């Protein structure tokens, strides 16, 4: 029922593949067992599932997940998500990967077109709408950066890669809301850099 087609990318905690699941095109993330930090690998897998029950136009949807995997795969589990393509905001901003918008830009003439004002506003609204929804559900992403914002063929931004996310539970001690996981240092919220409480 699940057939891997081609690799889309890999990161610190696993690899992502384009695949089919019951005939539908999906993305599959296999979270690998880390020999160096098994706890962090496990936390990343379960953090991805913080959004498993959510549905929103600007959040990558989880279709299914499983902790069953052949021993040969060295995998903690598999997460099946909607396929939104392989273009990220990072590709669009920096002209990398499959996206290279040819033309003369306004700054330096390096051959890459700057985002139009309309695109910038639309993308920003999509991201803010997705974040507002996540925060209304008590979920903080903790690794939001251009590489984790996917752009569909229809030009809709979807927030993905929830491996560092946390679900904030009301009534829990504030000390429990301190970030225990990584995330990209250069994109961290100021309160995390100061060692303060995570907030939505």
Curated annotation (Swiss-Prot):
Tagged with keyword ATP-binding: yes
Annotated source species: Nycticorax nycticorax (Black-crowned night-heron)
Catalysed reactions, as listed in the record: L-seryl-[protein] + ATP = O-phospho-L-seryl-[protein] + ADP + H(+); L-threonyl-[protein] + ATP = O-phospho-L-threonyl-[protein] + ADP + H(+)
Pfam families membership: Pkinase
The protein's name in its UniProt record: Serine/threonine-protein kinase mos
Key words, A-Z: ATP-binding, Kinase, Nucleotide-binding, Serine/threonine-protein kinase, Transferase
Active site: 143
Enzyme Commission no: 2.7.11.1
Residue ranges of every copy of the Protein kinase domain listed in the record: 2-200
GO molecular function: ATP binding; protein serine kinase activity; protein serine/threonine kinase activity
Positions contributing to ATP binding: 8-16, 29
Superkingdom per UniProt: Eukaryota
Coiled coil: none
Family: Belongs to the protein kinase superfamily. Ser/Thr protein kinase family.
């Amino acid at each position: 029922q699940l057939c891997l087609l081609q690799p889309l990318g890999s990161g610190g905690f696993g690899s992502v593949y384009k695949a089919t699941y019951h005939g539908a095109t999906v993305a599959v993330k296999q979270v690998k067992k880390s020999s160096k930090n098994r706890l962090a690998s496990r936390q990343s897998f379960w953090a991805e599932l913080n959004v498993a029950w959510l549905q929103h136009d600007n959040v990558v949807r989880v279709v299914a997940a499983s902790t069953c995997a052949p021993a040969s795969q060295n995998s903690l589990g598999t997460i099946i998500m909607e396929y939104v393509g392989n273009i990220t905001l990072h590709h669009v901003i920096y002209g990398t990967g499959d996206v290279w918008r040819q033309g003369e830009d306004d700054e330096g003439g390096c051959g890459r077109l700057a985002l139009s004002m309309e695109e910038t506003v639309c993308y920003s609204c999509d991201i803010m709408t997705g974040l507002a929804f996540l925060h209304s559900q008590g979920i903080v992403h903790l690794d939001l950066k251009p590489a984790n914002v996917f752009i569909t063929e229809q030009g809709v931004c979807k927030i993905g890669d929830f491996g560092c996310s946390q679900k904030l539970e009301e009534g829990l001690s504030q000390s429990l809301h301190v970030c225990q996981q990584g995330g990209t240092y250069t994109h961290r919220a100021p309160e995390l850099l100061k060692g303060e409480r995570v907030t939505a």
